C-alpha cells in the first residue's frame, strides 16, 4: 500500500544529477524485478506531478490500483478501505507513507526537492 502524492513509477522522467536510481522510480524498479505485484498493490491519494501531463499513465501501464486525491475525496474513506481490502486480501502488507500524501493545509512544511 503506497500513500503518496506522486506515483513513484516514473519511467520517462530523467534521473537527477546523474544518479543511477531515484525515489521517483522505485515503483517501476520493484515491479520490473518481480518484487511487487502491481495488481495487488494500491496507490492512494495521488495528486499529480508538475513535470508531465500523463503522470498516472505509468501506474496504469504497470497495473497498479490507483486512487487519486480527487477520487479519494469523492468516494470517501470507507469505500477506498473496502477496495484496498479486496485488492490486498489476506496477503502480507508493506505500507509506504510519504507525508506529501497529506493535504498541504495539514502538513505545510512537507516538500519534494
Q: Model-derived features: where do they sit?
A:
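Conserved alpha-helical scaffold segments that buttress catalytic/binding sites
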Residues: 1-113
Amino acid at each position: 500500500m503506497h500513500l503518496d502524492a506522486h506515483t513513484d513509477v516514473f519511467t520517462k522522467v530523467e534521473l537527477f544529477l546523474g544518479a543511477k536510481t531515484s525515489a521517483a522510480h522505485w515503483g517501476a524498479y520493484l515491479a520490473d524485478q518481480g518484487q511487487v505485484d502491481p495488481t495487488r498493490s494500491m496507490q492512494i491519494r495521488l495528486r499529480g506531478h508538475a513535470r508531465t501531463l500523463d503522470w498516472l499513465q505509468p501506474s496504469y501501464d504497470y497495473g497498479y490500483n490507483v486512487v487519486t486525491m480527487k477520487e479519494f475525496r469523492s468516494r470517501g474513506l470507507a469505500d477506498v478501505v473496502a477496495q484496498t481490502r479486496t485488492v490486498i486480501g489476506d496477503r502480507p502488507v508493506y505500507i509506504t507513507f510519504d507525508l506529501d500524501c497529506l493535504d498541504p493545509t495539514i502538513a505545510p512544511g512537507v516538500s519534494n526537492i
